[in-house]
Amino acid sequence: TTLFRSTEEELGNCINKAYDSKFDTPEIAPLVKKGNSYYLELFHGSTIAFKDMALSILPHLLTTAAKKNGVTNEIVILTATSGDTGKAAMAGFADVPGTRIIVFYPKDGVSPVQEKQMLTQKGENTAVVGIYGNFDDAQTGVKNIFNDKEMKEKLAGAGFQFSSANSINIGRLV
């Protein structure tokens, strides 16, 4: 069983949870006509970044798929960011049952506003870690954690498993 065989009701529940009061317009992504052009506004989410569109629904697709596939471990999201992804992912996963999120960012590689957004994100299951280095260093660190078999085994034994909110997760495209 996969999420792609989800019922209309399951997908509807994911959509309703994702695109609720966190968006400031009932249309979520309104199509606006200006002159002879049309624009799809993707900035109405809680972080005002287009990434809110995918990262608001990803936690609900992920937890629905996990439940359908009998996954009982808590899912620990590890994500590297150079800015927008971190805050949008943290906002999407904040207080979603069965998940935790840890965002790694270059301490001197994001804007002061982005850093403050991440550091002040509410949620009992959210954490953010500033690293010395650049985005590539943060991403390499996350990849190294994913590839550490011993760590994965220990975490699995404690009831946890890793996933990501970066674009390597197919859920970002769904």
Where are these regions (language model features)?
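Small/polar-residue-rich loop-to-helix segments that shape phosphate-bearing ligand pockets
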Residues: F104-V174
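Glycine/threonine-rich beta-strand-loop-alpha-helix active-site module
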Residues: I77-K116, Q121
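Catalytic cores of large soluble enzymes that bind and process phosphate-bearing ligands
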Residues: T7, G45-F50, A54, I77, ...
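Well-ordered mid-protein domain cores that form the structural environment of catalytic cofactors
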Residues: Y38-G92
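Short, small-residue-biased leader/transition segments that mark boundaries at the very start
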Residues: T2-L3
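Conserved internal helical-beta-strand scaffold that buttresses enzyme catalytic cores
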Residues: T25, S46, T99-I101, G133, ...
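Anion-binding (especially nucleotide phosphate/pyrophosphate-binding) glycine-rich loop
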Residues: S6-F43
